[in-house]
């Protein structure tokens, strides 16, 4: 229990420092800053949504990895989940076990609900990726598959 509480405080501290650092940089910097938070659901806090809103215009790439939307809801409910989804432009979905979760992802992809069964049946190493270009309104979809080198 205490480990989870400490993880939340540490996560908040890391994101607070990240947000302050990025917003202090030049907005027109040619260099991209990458920030990757694996297993975000274990240490994320509501403050991350605020940070995402602030750093979008600073040539920053933030990758949040989590197991399901339930992780986001546990942090801050449906509003927090919406805040995270609305402040990101790329969604990568690997195989989902839960059909309701797969349908929710299919809706985010803007595809028919029947795509949920395709998302649910992805093989190990496969992922669906959707990227939205806010400048041109383009939507690009890819099926990403890991290449087996054996």
UniProtKB/Swiss-Prot annotation:
It comes from the Bacteria. Pfam families: TrwB_AAD_bind. InterPro entries: P-loop_NTPase, T4SS_TraD_DNA-bd. This is Uncharacterized protein MPN_513.
């Amino acid at each position: 229990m205490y480990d989870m509480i400490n993880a939340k405080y540490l996560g908040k501290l890391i994101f607070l420092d990240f947000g302050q650092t990025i917003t202090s940089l030049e907005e027109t910097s040619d260099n991209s800053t990458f920030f990757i938070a694996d297993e975000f659901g274990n240490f994320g806090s509501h403050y991350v949504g605020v940070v995402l809103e602030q750093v979008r215009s600073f040539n920053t790439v933030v990758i949040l990895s989590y197991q399901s939307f339930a992780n986001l809801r546990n942090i801050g409910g449906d509003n927090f989940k919406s805040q995270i989804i609305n402040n990101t432009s790329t969604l990568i979905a690997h195989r989902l076990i839960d059909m309701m979760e797969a349908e929710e992802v299919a809706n985010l992809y803007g595809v028919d609900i029947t795509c949920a069964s395709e998302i649910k049946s992805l093989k190990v190493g496969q992922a669906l990726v959707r990227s939205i270009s806010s400048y041109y309104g383009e939507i690009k979809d890819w099926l990403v598959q890991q290449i087996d080198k054996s």
